[in-house]
């Protein structure tokens, strides 16, 4: 089965997708805009309807004075025990505290909770996954801002309580990626007998790519796919570039698809990395 692209034209970066029964729900980054984190719904991955936003009020997030590359970005949408979760990085004005937050709702159309901050984890692009024991793991791109100059630590994870934000384990170094720069945007999946770790690498410009690894548990150890990257438009001739930041979902016919971002080329860029 084929699907037309783009799913959404215009400014709809960092997609994350969830299949719930016959319905698909997709959330995007919204950065400094409120209402934020738009939620679209579809039954066929072709026809989509905007059904609401995660962020609709000041009690959830304050965006006044936020820079264009600040605000909220790289959300993940998941469902566990009948409750929908969206986790996302929230960055305030320059110098103000930021963090990874979790919002919940009984339906993706909302209303969504005021949210909680996960205390003690430093990074961006959070993901949520539940293992066979019901434990919740937050994977993220480790990024320490405390020194004034961000220090990157690759893909990391920790066991958390998603309802309180409490961190229940030490931070674990998951994966350094497949060899491109700055692994980020992780997503964990249990498929069959393996766990899979999907990531974005290569920076968010022309070198953007999607890579994958697999292992026996949500904490690895991880075996990088020999054909990484599994998706990229790294070139000087593709009409759509910067392709990456993917999330996997099962299609109506039982196959698999990936949603990702892409940019039509215009002017100069930071090139490859």
Label every PLM stretch briefly.
Residues 1-273:
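Carbohydrate-active catalytic/glycan-binding domains of CAZyme proteins
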């Amino acid at each position: 089965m084929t699907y037309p692209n783009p799913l959404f034209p215009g400014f709809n970066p960092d997609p994350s997708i969830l299949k719930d029964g016959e319905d698909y729900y997709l959330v995007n980054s919204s950065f400094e805009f409120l209402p934020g984190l738009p939620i679209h719904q579809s039954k066929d991955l072709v026809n989509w309807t905007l059904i609401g936003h995660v962020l609709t009020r000041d009690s959830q997030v304050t965006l006044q004075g936020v820079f264009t590359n600040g605000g909220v970005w790289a959300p993940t949408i998941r469902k566990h025990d009948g409750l929908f979760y969206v986790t996302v990085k929230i960055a305030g004005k320059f110098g103000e505290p930021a963090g990874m937050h979790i919002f919940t709702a009984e339906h993706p159309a909302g209303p969504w909770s005021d949210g909680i901050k996960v205390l003690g984890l430093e990074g961006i692009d959070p993901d949520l996954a539940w293992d066979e024991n019901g434990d919740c793991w937050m994977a993220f791109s480790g990024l320490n801002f405390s020194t004034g100059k961000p220090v990157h630590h690759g893909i990391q994870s920790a066991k958390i309580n998603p309802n309180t934000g409490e961190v229940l384990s030490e931070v674990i170094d998951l994966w350094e990626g497949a060899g491109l720069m700055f692994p980020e945007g992780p997503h964990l999946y249990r498929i069959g007998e393996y766990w899979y770790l999907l990531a974005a690498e290569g920076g968010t410009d022309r070198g953007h790519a999607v890579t994958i690894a697999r292992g026996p548990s949500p904490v690895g150890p991880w075996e990088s796919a020999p054909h990484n990257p599994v998706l990229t438009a790294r070139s000087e001739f593709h009409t759509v570039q910067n392709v990456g930041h993917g999330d996997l979902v099962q299609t109506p016919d039982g196959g698999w698809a990936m949603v990702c971002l892409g940019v039509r080329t215009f002017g100069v860029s930071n090139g490859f990395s």
